[in-house]
Regions:
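Structured mid-to-C-terminal alpha-helical surface segments
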Residues: 1-18, 28-40, 44-234
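Active-site glycine-centered loops adjacent to acidic/histidine catalytic or metal-binding residues
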Residues: 23
Length: 234
């Protein structure tokens, strides 16, 4: 994970065209790796014409595939390439000698962001020497995370959201954070949840916490699911 992120942020072309977002950005650059997240979710940055974007997409794909192949990763047949999303699934053998997979997703549909990008330090000591990565602004990442929690209600979304609330990350900019949530709600769903109905959060079962969250937590503290649900809905 470190070597790939380092490549994406030291290769001039890749750095200029991509920004990290999602759970990996949250748990590497905002929090000190309380939960493991290795999927690399990226936004394509330049706001170009359709034709220009197609050309840049081809070049970007060639650079990424060449690098990953040189590093010993093999592209899986489970990879998906759609209208505006490229999902590269790479197989590799990990340090324990087991087969593993890392996912790199590049979204080409969101090329205009609310805030400028941020160069953020990876805060965990697990990477050794600190590196900087270009990310979507933290407020935007959590606005998208909030909408994901409301819509798909995944255990990891609840965990990340409640960590944000516990740390009061945007307590001095709550109005702007709400605007960002509305912005991402309008662009990320086929049907906008105008009432911001949070009832889907109630569907998160403790079995999902045990299967999807506990295995990737650095420290498995007692998890008060009902308390976390209430906190998120408030």
């Amino acid at each position: 994970l470190r070597t790939i992120l380092e490549f994406l942020n030291t290769h001039e072309y890749m750095y200029e065209h991509l920004m990290l977002k999602g759970g990996t950005a949250i748990n590497l650059t905002v929090f000190n790796l309380p939960r493991l997240s290795v999927d690399i979710d990226l936004d394509f940055v330049p706001n170009l014409t359709r034709e220009e974007t197609i050309d840049e997409r081809v070049r970007l794909t060639e650079i990424l595939k060449k690098y990953m192949s040189e590093q010993g990763y093999s592209l899986s047949e489970t990879s998906r390439f759609s209208h505006s999303l490229d999902a590269f699934h790479y197989n590799y053998v990990n340090a324990a000698g087991n087969r593993d997979m890392i996912k790199i997703e590049i979204n080409y549909s969101l090329r205009t962001h609310v805030f400028s990008s941020e160069d953020r330090l990876v805060v965990t000591d697990a990477f050794g020497e600190p590196i900087k990565v270009r990310t979507v602004a933290a407020m935007e990442i959590f606005a998208a995370k909030t909408n994901a929690l409301i819509s798909r209600a995944a255990a990891r979304d609840l965990y990340d959201f409640c960590n944000m609330a516990d740390m009061k990350l945007f307590s001095d900019a709550e109005n702007m954070f709400r605007k960002c949530i509305i912005f991402y709600a309008t662009i990320s769903a086929n049907k906008v949840n105008k009432n911001f109905d949070t009832s889907a959060i109630d569907s998160i079962a403790f079995s999902k916490i045990k299967s999807d969250l506990f295995p990737v937590l650095a420290v498995r503290d007692k998890f008060n699911l009902e308390g976390k649900k209430h906190q998120a809905k408030e």
